[in-house]
Amino acid sequence: MTPKELVLEAVAAIFLNFDPTAAEQLLASDFIQHNPGVPTGAAPILGFIPGLKDSGIVVDVHRVISEGDMVVLHTTYNNAQAFGAETLVGFDVFRVEDGKVAEHWDNLTPITAPNPSGHTQTDGPTDVTDLNKTADNKALVTDFVETILKNGDVDRITDFLSTERYIQHNSNIADGLDGLGAALAGMAEQGIEMVYTDVHF
């Protein structure tokens, strides 16, 4: 199996089929968990499965991005009280090693109403169509994070973001550079500052 196939099969075993036996075959025994609410190791995950089944949790996978041994899922968790809310939207990052899911990071947030431009946290394109541009796109996004978010060189923002069509999925921000600028100004007025210190590859 490819890393993508392996991760999707593991997610199905844990969240769709609630099958600890199948999940055990897909998780490394020394599975590393970065979610602070879940102990590390495969055993805690396997022990959690019956409770997930009883909770009625339903997981919808919207997007899958895979490169090398890393796989990212964009998901919605419904009936997710076990994770702290009725419905959560999440990004899950998995690392695969020796044919097993070996490591996991995630970021979960409650679902919200559409943003001022009518976009939700999960709508939009789901298929990657320009695979021939993967290296260029990765370099562009990495440069954006380094230049704008980390170093704060906001005068160069139009080097990275379209002035004609910039779609925003943040629940509180409207489309376009004007929407982004207004949101950042509002954050500044409230003393909220985004600080990026490291880019992890």
Can you describe what each PLM-predicted range is?
Residues 1-201:
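C-terminal and inter-domain tail/linker signature
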